[in-house]
Amino acid sequence: MKVIFMGTPEFAVPALKKLITHHEVKAVFTQQPKAKGRGLNLAKSPIHQLAFEHQIPVYTPSTLRNDEIINLINKVNADIIVVIAYGFIVPKAILEAKKYGCLNIHPSDLPRHRGAAPLQRTIIEGDRKSSVCIMRMDTGLDTGDILMKEDFDLEERITLEELHNKCANLGAELLIKTLANIDNIVPITQPSDGVTYAHKLTKAEGKINWHESAYKIDCKIRGMNPWPGVYFSYNDKIIKILEAEYLNADHHFTSGTVISDKLEIACGSGILRVKKLQQESKKALNIEEFLRGTNILKDTVLK
């Protein structure tokens, strides 16, 4: 099948690799190179780099909402468009430009976690099951019909990186199965109940509320690493918690109280045992290394 591919980050790479192997990728659309590192050198997106290596024509428009781009897409000899974490809204004229429309890989149990941050919200909300869906896109926000779906259980303390990699690889496999059977698949309309929205994360969400349960805070730590990171302030400095574990233990302490010299912290319910931290502008350290340089005393009440 002849394919136009639209995507940008690492999450989209396994799918493009599979398409290059099994189909004919006629063109790739991705975000423009961005300044990176101290030298602010322009860096191609992971999808741009992969397409470049395979000599596939690459386009980096600043929007899809203009006639020039729509005409360009109409001229590309393709049967279908695949869109994965591209970063731009796809207008109706492009959604309907090819025989089989536009397909999308969405890493959640739709209609749960529609929107920009389904992986993060899955972990933050403490979900124990999830799915990867192949969806035919329409003009709504992740409201299209489901062509193929695979459910799976989540390990209790799965990290964002682990879930990202699992869904990226599973989505790539499902995409190839979908394309192989596309003429025989009966699309399934998403149910109207159970709809939630996975809104984009904000930096403010990362600030710890010690009145929440240790379990909830641990979910946030795993779901918000690396960005925005979960943090507290101590001596007017921001300290991120990169790794922790929660203990379902009863206590009588005020929420936010450091109850041991190993940085165990009383929460609204349960105790958070911190394992890895990073002070602003410094490197990440395990708890032993961190406490050698920053002594947070027992009985301190953190804010």
Swiss-Prot record:
Gene3D superfamilies: 3.40.50.12230. It catalyses: L-methionyl-tRNA(fMet) + (6R)-10-formyltetrahydrofolate = N-formyl-L-methionyl-tRNA(fMet) + (6S)-5,6,7,8-tetrahydrofolate + H(+). This is Methionyl-tRNA formyltransferase. Its EC number is 2.1.2.9. GO terms for molecular function: methionyl-tRNA formyltransferase activity. (6S)-5,6,7,8-tetrahydrofolate binds at S108, D109, L110, P111. NCBIfam families: fmt (TIGR00460). The gene is fmt. SUPFAM superfamilies: FMT C-terminal domain-like, Formyltransferase. It is an enzyme of class 2 (transferase).
